[in-house]
């Protein structure tokens, strides 16, 4: 999952919402 208010790392190690 991703939080539009913060930078979160996925289980794959990818960074979303840079």
Swiss-Prot record:
Q: What broad class describes the main subcellular location of this protein? A: plastid
Q: What is any one GO biological process for this UniProt entry?
A: L-arginine biosynthetic process
Q: What compartments host this protein?
A: Plastid, Chloroplast
Record-listed E.C. numbers:
6.3.4.5
Pathway listed:
Amino-acid biosynthesis; L-arginine biosynthesis; L-arginine from L-ornithine and carbamoyl phosphate: step 2/3
UniProt key word ATP-binding: yes
On whether Transport is a keyword of this UniProt record, the answer is no
Alphabetically, the GO molecular function entries are: argininosuccinate synthase activity; ATP binding
Q: How does the record describe its quaternary structure?
A: Homotetramer.
Q: What is the protein name for this chain?
A: Argininosuccinate synthase, chloroplastic
Which lineage ranks, top first, belong to the organism behind this chain? Eukaryota, Viridiplantae, Streptophyta, Embryophyta, Tracheophyta
